[in-house]
Amino acid sequence: GGGTATCCGMSDTSTGSGPAFLATDGIHNFRDYGGYPTQGGGRVRSGLLFRSGQHVEASEADLQTFADLGIRTVIDLRGNAERERHPCRRPDLWDGDVVFYDGETSSRPPHEPDRPMELTAQSAHERMLKVYTRMPHNEAMQTIFGQYLRALAEREGASLVHCFAGKDRTGIAAALLHHILGVSRADMLAEFLRTNDAPTYDILERQSLPGIEARLGGPLDRAAVAELMEVREAYF
């Protein structure tokens, strides 16, 4: 079995439906996705499974939180271009492993439009539905999801899985693991939707919105932004 990790740095922003989000300065949506009951009376272990957005703006305090959690393996679901544009920070003395796909997992992060278009809440919602519909058929995503599951099965200690925002690709990765472990669909959905309660929405907007608006030529409708930055039950 894997080693244990100390759950420290927790914020006071628990929704009551799962472990609290970790308090961070520059990492969006950082949380433990363990703790859920499984069929047969078991429970997914807490303190071993973490998820988040990218760590490109991680502060020194964030890196200390990362180190204190005992994370030995990072599974980065982003493709090469994303990782080169937004290199993640790690603690100076961290000697863990980063698992990644050597290629592109997405032509652009799922919440960023590929080309100039008039984005309304409806068109943004429809775009995100297509992202989730295509994901199971994306060979790169199939490969990295397999790498993720193998890493959890074979490696000791705590792990962290992340993409750009920690909500779409990461949300499906967490759901795949929960499904395998026998977590109920209701709890899987609740975990997926907890992204919308993350107290770090400003970090995601800061990292995503300027680039999106630059490509589209102006400010976006707030309802459209919400469809891109949040998750919906329909996406699951």
Identify the residue ranges that each predicted region occupies.
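Ser/Thr-glycine-rich phosphate-binding loops at phosphate-binding pockets of nucleotides
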Residues: A165, R169-T170
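Compositionally biased, low-complexity flexible segments
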Residues: G1-T4
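Cys-dependent protein tyrosine phosphatase-like superfamily
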Residues: C7-L160, I172-F236
